[in-house]
Curated annotation (Swiss-Prot):
High-level lineage: Bacteria, Pseudomonadati, Pseudomonadota, Gammaproteobacteria, Enterobacterales
Protein known as: Alpha-hemolysin translocation ATP-binding protein HlyB
GO cellular component: plasma membrane; type I protein secretion system complex
Any one GO molecular function term: ATP binding
Domain named ABC transmembrane type-1: residues: 154-436
Job description of the protein: Part of the ABC transporter complex HlyBD involved in hemolysin export. Transmembrane domains (TMD) form a pore in the inner membrane and the ATP-binding domain (NBD) is responsible for energy generation.
Quaternary structure (record): Homodimer.
Residues binding ATP: G502, R503, S504, G505, S506, G507, K508, S509
Gene transcribed to yield this protein: hlyB
Amino acid sequence: MDSCHKIDYGLYALEILAQYHNVSVNPEEIKHRFDTDGTGLGLTSWLLAAKSLELKVKQVKKTIDRLNFISLPALVWREDGCHFILTKVSKEANRYLIFDLEQRNPRVLEQSEFEALYQGHIILIASRSSVTGKLAKFDFTWFIPAIIKYRKIFIETLVVSVFLQLFALITPLFFQVVMDKVLVHRGFSTLNVITVALSVVVVFEIILSGLRTYIFAHSTSRIDVELGAKLFRHLLALPISYFESRRVGDTVARVRELDQIRNFLTGQALTSVLDLLFSFIFFAVMWYYSPKLTLVILFSLPCYAAWSVFISPILRRRLDDKFSRNADNQSFLVESVTAINTIKAMAVSPQMTNIWDKQLAGYVAAGFKVTVLATIGQQGIQLIQKTVMIINLWLGAHLVISGDLSIGQLIAFNMLAGQIVAPVIRLAQIWQDFQQVGISVTRLGDVLNSPTESYHGKLALPEINGDITFRNIRFRYKPDSPVILDNINLSIKQGEVIGIVGRSGSGKSTLTKLIQRFYIPENGQVLIDGHDLALADPNWLRRQVGVVLQDNVLLNRSIIDNISLANPGMSVEKVIYAAKLAGAHDFISELREGYNTIVGEQGAGLSGGQRQRIAIARALVNNPKILIFDEATSALDYESEHVIMRNMHKICKGRTVIIIAHRLSTVKNADRIIVMEKGKIVEQGKHKELLSEPESLYSYLYQLQSD
């Protein structure tokens, strides 16, 4: 720690935190602008530098016991310059996961170790332009701007609700007049007038109620469409790391939670809230009739609320358990359907069925517990309602007998009380839905609150030439995961064909993911034509990079649509030319529908080799300046591979080509071969040059394949 003042760890921390939030940062520029005296970034200059990157930063003082309530990662600032990044807090285990800026590695600290390092100063960081900022966080407050946006429609709904409540107030008064005046004085003419008036009120009440439901459903449907569109756009904008760290079933289950929110918005819950808001009008009239009976109704309302509050935490836990089990089932189902060929080939259907039965039984049991608890909650509400009814009947009868209240007034009072209690009971009975929606919002927030790939402020540069430079690259997938690439320095010239080989797990594919800007390195820069990819628009880059993987996915469309996926308006001639280069034209021509043949889900209607050749054509059709083959020919038969290799000269012409291969014969004609081992470049040269070194790793791998 004594050497901390010699190195500017604040600058390094800013670089890491900016990259975490997908914000471009140039360390040299930051140092030039804010480290004017060359002593490193002080606290004030660090905050200014962060704000210049459009980061939302706030310095706070927090005791250790409050750290599990803050948004992480955050920078722990120390006076001696030995800052570190706090990434995770486990209060149960009293452990803290930090990123040690000095060691450039994650560390797990015990409580005593952390207390020795923590000085109480911490800097909270969020991206202003991304959904990680507090103002953009998806929770119940997200609906407030949506309501404001459609405020005109909601005001119309409120106006209609006012008239509905007035009509609901008139009806009990008519009944009171009939009971106390018409029946006593046998006033048939008055009865006829009241009947006609009541009929008019009923007709208008039905019309207004239907109109309110229509207006409300229309507005909530628009909010639903807006949320659904936002969700899908955000999902596609998430970085690759989000999907690689989660099961497909989990993501699908979270997206499906939108259905719960939709049902809640279009249900009776919100209209019940509106009805409840106008209850003060009824209370005023009820108080006029009988303060004693009104107090009984008033005192019952806290009972409804208390019972619901008592039930809700237990219900929420059980709903959470139900969701988790449903997500497990969803993941297992997706996995089983995806791996159906393996399951059938290995005859493990009974094992999979047993696992499914156990998981399904757990889900059904969790759902049964939710139903039982919800039933208990509803019966408790019914008990309160019946008890209040009995008390009102007894007390109301006493008031009528004593002459303090007429029979008509008692009937009118009970009708008015029903107008108040009915929405309360409805709200209490749908409390389960509200708890479910709360969980749905939280689960959906896992998607919508995850930072997307940053496009704001990125550079859309001119057409690239193909020069690629890796400069001092250090990379790991997660802060607590092993280093995948370590001190990579590599220059690839425009038009050069590079082969990358090595054992599995040596970092070959990771290197190409950095070229596509799927990830930003922990340290160092990836440059194309001298431009730092951290500052470049990902879409601009990926449109000019063609990639063919070992396992490519085709969409359930025609062959021509799959090949021209990135540019649907492309001419048929260009599609056919790309297919010929990929060796796919001949087999496509033999199909009954030719290029209009639907390939099926994930290309299920084609063989593995055919799918691979279409994927190669898809990568070539846009004439990319950089072409990456990641084990692209390993799934091809020898005849198809021969066609590809025969056309390789045409494929590589005018492009920078990177070929990753375990089959060394694929790269022996490359301009240069890069050999990787444990995340480092250990050898490079031409095929014959590498074989001339008998002790080299390349020679060893080549000898194994020759044998």
